[in-house]
Design a protein with these regions (language model features):
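Short alpha-helix boundary/capping motifs
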Residues: 63-67, 141, 167-168, 177
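Short, flexible segments with low predicted structural confidence
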Residues: 6-8, 77-78, 84-85, 111, ...
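Generic secondary-structure boundary/loop-capping signal
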Residues: 63-65, 122, 197
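Acidic/histidine-rich alpha-helical segments that form the ligand environment
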Residues: 88-119, 167-200, 216-221
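Short, charged, surface-exposed hinge/linker loops at domain edges
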Residues: 1-3, 44-99
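Generic signal for short, ordered secondary-structure residues
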Residues: 14-15, 81, 85, 92, ...
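Short, contiguous alpha-helical
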Residues: 5-18, 22-29, 36-55, 114, ...
């Protein structure tokens, strides 16, 4: 049996569960109980995902259990612009070697995303299911812009990549590639102090009281892309029915 600590963010009608030992492994549901019930299967799927991408993973154990190690109430990253919790493990300094592991996970998530959307005609990229829904193209722009934003939580504005100033002029797939390349390059140049500090950036946010660390930003980068890859997968499935 394997037991994993999990962390949850809870509002009145939504809950997001995270397995921080497996960055990118999350479950979003309408209640705490449903989230916790679904997390063991999500962990098993995430381990299978890591194996598919060639990551070293221990042999599968049965059963998988979860233990709530921390909870945050009243807010969570359920919609663009929402604040996200800083859990105790997020406060640990990130080593350069650990950063490369996160970058590898980001690469796996990007490979999954591109496998879904590369080759789609413009008609499908721009199809809107209803008045409130986002097109796939808009989701892709959001994914790239989010990487800018995560980096901007950690690095001084004057040190951010100049390529970001006119990124909206790039075709969407060139945009995604540029954002990833420049974001990773800038993150690799974080100082030791920046990789261990907890900061409260007030720029480009409605939540200046939200704490950030390098580990939280890297975790959210992996989680965020995997969440939106799932969203696009659902859109494409709906288009087939």
């Amino acid at each position: 049996m394997s037991r994993y600590p999990v962390y949850v963010e809870i509002t009145d009608d939504l809950c997001l569960g995270h397995c921080l030992d497996l960055p990118g492994c999350t479950v979003r549901a309408s209640s705490r109980a449903e989230t916790l019930a679904r997390l063991p299967a999500a962990i098993r799927e995430h381990l299978a995902w890591l194996r598919r991408h060639g990551e070293p993973v221990a042999p599968e154990a049965d059963p998988i259990e979860v233990e709530v190690a921390g909870e945050s109430h009243g807010f969570g990253p359920f919609n663009p612009g929402d604040s996200a919790a800083l859990f105790p493990p997020d406060r640990a300094p990130v080593t350069l070697e650990e950063m490369e592991v996160y970058f590898r996970l980001m690469g796996h998530a990007r490979a999954d995303l591109l496998a879904l959307v590369e080759g789609l005609p413009d008609e499908m990229l721009d199809r809107q299911q209803n008045a409130e829904s986002w097109t796939i193209r808009r989701i892709l722009r959001h994914v790239g812009n989010a990487e800018e934003w995560y980096v901007s939580r950690l690095a001084p504005p004057e040190t951010l990549p100049a390529e970001w100033e006119h990124d909206d002029e790039l075709p969407v797939f060139e945009f995604l590639a540029m954002e990833r390349r420049t974001a990773v390059d800038r993150l690799r140049r974080l100082t030791a102090e920046e990789r261990e500090a907890a900061v409260y950036p007030a720029r480009w946010t409605n939540h200046p009281d939200e704490p950030w660390t390098a580990r939280k930003a890297l975790r959210r980068a992996v989680e965020h892309e995997r969440e939106h890859t799932g969203q696009i997968r659902e859109i494409l499935l709906c288009d087939k029915t």
